[in-house]
Every structure is written in C-alpha cells, then in structure tokens.
Amino acid sequence: MFVRSGILAASILLSVTSCAAPSLEDAQRHVMPLGQTSFAQYAADAKAWIGANRSFVLDTDEGRKMELEANLPKEYRPEHSDGRGILLVHGLGDSPWSFSDIAQSLAANGILVRTVLLPGCGTQPADMMPATADDWRRVVQEQADILSREVDEMWLGGYSTGCNLVLDYADANPGRTKGFVLFSPAVEVRPPFAWAASFVSNFRDWLVTPEIRSSTSWCR
C-alpha cells in the first residue's frame, strides 16, 4: 500500500492528471507510445520520440546527439553473462543517464542491464503534464515482463520514484523478482509538516528556489 501511495503522491506533486499495442490515445495525449514486444523496438521508438519532441539545450549537432543518447533507454550486455538481468528505473525529471556508471559496473560483472525512460521525461517539462502514474507503471510492467523471459534471474533497481515503481511491480507480480537495488527510495515522507505541502503550493511554487544547473540539464 505504501508503494502505491508514494507513486500517487509523486503524481499529485507534479500536477499530473489524469494495454496493449501503441494506441491513438497515447498520441493524442502526447505521451511516448508504449506496447512494444521487445526492448530493441522500445528503445528505437523512444529514440524517434525524443528526437522529434525534445527541446534541445545544446546548439551543436554533436551536442544534440549527446543529449539524445543521454536520455535513451539503453542495454548494457555483458561479455560473459551469468544469467542475471536487472531493469533500472530513474526518478522524476531525470533520465536513464543517471545509471550510466552503475550499469557499466554491473555489466562488467556478468549482469544484463537495461534502463527505461519514464513517459513524460526526456523531452521537455510540459510533457510531464499528460503523463500519469499508470503510464510509468506500464513501461515498468512491459519491460520487466520482457526481461524476465530472457534471463534466469531478474533483479529490479530504481532511484527515488523509480524505487516505488519497481516495488509496485514486484508487489503486483510476486515471485518474479530475485531482489532489488534501490537508491534513495521514496517510500515514506518523514518531515512533520509534509502534510502542508498541498496547501502551501497554492501560494508559492518553492520554499527554496531550486538552482538551475545548466551544465547538466542536457542529460535529463
């Protein structure tokens, strides 16, 4: 229950409103189409979607190529597989690039690593508006199901909201997941005045204005 509550809370904080093959409804909502039957097709469709819809930060061809690659779902295939695989899910407003270091390390140890891109991320902030928690659940469900059929032992990993999503999947699909690799899991809000966030948001967007780090904004 706390996992689903965490995902719902993330959706509300971002003002996100609100299964099979890629649908016309997805296109009408301006959400990255899902429903692919392989990781390769999913990654190819994501590349086409990001290329057509991203507001690029860098203004050179090389820079845009670097931006595109940073936001793509990726597969890190080990030279010598030991039969294990892991699906890594990033947090809100982030990208698969956040796992680039750990993914290479895991692959070097014989693990097949795949990352996903949450719908609404990777293009421009406005694209978070039509995306829903169900869209995020769906991409995890689809790609975890695909991975589980291709490896002997499936692990799931996440950062922040990504942790909620993989735990939610495991709760809904008992027995499929061997274990978890979780970074900063967002499963409980402990500050005593967190309940007031929805009220305060009527008067100001931020308690502390966030720092805009242009040096890394290209990778998310």
Report each predicted region and the residues it spans:
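The alpha/beta-hydrolase serine catalytic core
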Residues: 24, 28-67, 185-220
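Short, surface-exposed "cap/lid" segments of acyl-processing enzymes
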Residues: 69-118
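Short beta-to-alpha linker loops that shape the active-site pocket of alpha/beta-hydrolase fold enzymes
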Residues: 117-122, 186
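Catalytic nucleophile-loop/oxyanion-hole region of alpha/beta-hydrolase
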Residues: 124-150, 155
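Gly/Ala-rich beta-loop-alpha elbow adjacent to hydrolase catalytic centers
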Residues: 158-162, 166
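Active-site signature of alpha/beta-hydrolase-fold catalytic machinery across serine-
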Residues: 168-172
